[in-house]
Curated annotation (Swiss-Prot):
Subunit structure: Heterodimer of SbcC and SbcD.
GO BP field: DNA recombination; DNA replication
Protein name as catalogued: Nuclease SbcCD subunit D
Entry keyword Hydrolase: yes
GO terms assigned for molecular function: 3'-5' exonuclease activity; endonuclease activity
High-level lineage: Bacteria, Bacillati, Bacillota, Bacilli, Bacillales
InterPro entries: Calcineurin-like_PHP_ApaH (IPR004843), DNA_Repair-Maintenance_Comp (IPR050535), Metallo-depent_PP-like (IPR029052), Mre11_N (IPR041796), SbcCD_nuclease (IPR053381), SbcD (IPR004593), SbcD_C (IPR026843)
Keyword match Cytoplasm: no
The protein's role, per its UniProt record: SbcCD cleaves DNA hairpin structures. These structures can inhibit DNA replication and are intermediates in certain DNA recombination reactions. The complex acts as a 3'->5' double strand exonuclease that can open hairpins. It also has a 5' single-strand endonuclease activity.
Length: 373
């Protein structure tokens, strides 16, 4: 049996004011073409299909087109669950009718102990839910963390587990120790959001969404597919794609399959003049770029100048102000006032004080000392 595991499409995502629908349409077209080659028995989408609970019409249309090609044209069964970014009611609309074409949409807990059986494999679904939603569903005020809530869910599923079959869990959550990125919205505020791996022991394999790094956690049976695209500059350099999971004679194996996007996220560090004069290495000028540059304090509108050469510049950081706080605190504590000012001026401008500037500052310091006396 072959299963394709994907998640975190985040359709409609806007990064630093840039709408990413073109990039998402490109990668979904590539994904569909790959599925023609893969010919999987089923595709699992583990949450966050949309980036917001109220996606745009274009984002909705893009999802409908992709699912239509996969499910109706290629006739591949699909299981999808809601993530913390998805609007449950919107994603679940028409779900009972879609099941006639083996498109299974799960957005709540009403069927957590009723697996979807495909080719003898039982797929249990555990869509994203807040702590308060789990507390309300189980009518249990003692549930105060995701760990407690998910544990209660697994306890509900456990009596239904067929130990003679392969049992797979699909969920959208954070496993303790998983690598996070800036584009993942926190699941909770003020409570512990991660879940310990041991809670999943009753399952043969676990397919997760939420964390965007495909290797967020090192485990033989608990896997994240990662997002289809890089969605924050903290993800720059990360491979993106999907997981191919195979089951042969009861043995489960998986491999990550990378996809090449239309554009990547790239971070460029260096001198402002070198970048403007194109003396730095950039993989692709059309990539989405975050520049971290020195010596640009004198430039009136550096972002506009950069965009004339690098049209998809999305972020600019003035590196002049970055420093090692601990080391500088120790160094400054051993300096006199004049030396500190000289160091600060050099740090900001990369120049030394002129004799005229030094004399003026010395006079000011001497006058202040006289006032204190």
């Amino acid at each position: 049996m072959k299963i394709i595991h994907t998640a975190d499409w985040h359709l409609g995502k806007i990064l630093n004011g840039k709408q990413l629908l073109e990039d998402q349409a490109y990668i979904l077209d590539m994904f569909v073409e790959k599925m023609k080659e893969e010919e999987p028995d089923i595709i699992v989408i583990a949450g966050d299909l949309y980036d917001t609970t109220y996606p745009s019409k274009d984002a909705i249309m893009l999802l409908e087109q992709a699912i239509g090609k996969l499910n109706l044209e290629l006739r591949i069964p699909i299981i999808m669950i809601s993530g913390n970014h998805d609007g449950k009611e919107r994603l679940n609309y028409g779900a009972s009718w879609f099941e006639n074409n083996q498109l299974f949409i799960r957005t709540d807990f009403t069927s957590i102990n009723s697996p979807i059986e495909i080719n003898g494999v039982n797929f249990y679904t555990l869509p994203y839910a807040t702590v308060s939603e789990m507390k309300h569903y189980f009518e249990d005020d003692t549930i105060e963390t995701h760990q407690q809530g998910i544990t209660r869910c697994i306890e509900t599923i456990a009596p239904e587990i067929d130990e003679g079959a392969i049992n797979i869990l699909i969920s959208h959550l954070t496993v303790q120790g998983g690598k996070t990125s800036d584009s993942e919205r926190p699941l909770t505020i003020g409570t512990v959001e991660s879940v310990q791996k041991g809670v999943f022991d009753i399952f043969d394999y676990v397919m997760l969404g939420h964390l965007h790094h495909p290797f967020s956690i090192e485990d033989d049976k608990i896997k994240y597919s990662g997002s289809l695209l890089q969605y924050s500059f903290s993800e720059a350099g990360q491979a993106k794609g999907y997981r191919r999971v195979t089951i042969n004679d009861g043995i489960i194996n998986d491999v990550f399959i990378p996809l090449k996007p239309l554009r990547q996220l790239e971070i460029i560090s260096g001198e402002y003049n070198d970048v403007i004069n194109e003396k730095v290495h950039v993989k692709n000028k059309d990539n989405y770029l975050h520049f971290k540059l020195k010596n640009m304090s004198h430039i009136t509108d550096p972002m506009m100048s950069l965009k004339q050469i690098y049209p998809n510049t999305l972020a600019l950081t003035n590196e002049t102000f970055s420093y090692n706080e601990e080391n500088n605190a120790i160094e400054i504590s051993e300096k006199d006032d004049m030396s500190i000012i000289e160091m600060f001026y050099n740090h900001i401008t990369d120049k030394e004080l002129s004799d005229i500037q030094s004399n003026k500052i010395k006079n000011i310091l001497e006058n202040e000392l006289r006032k204190e006396d």
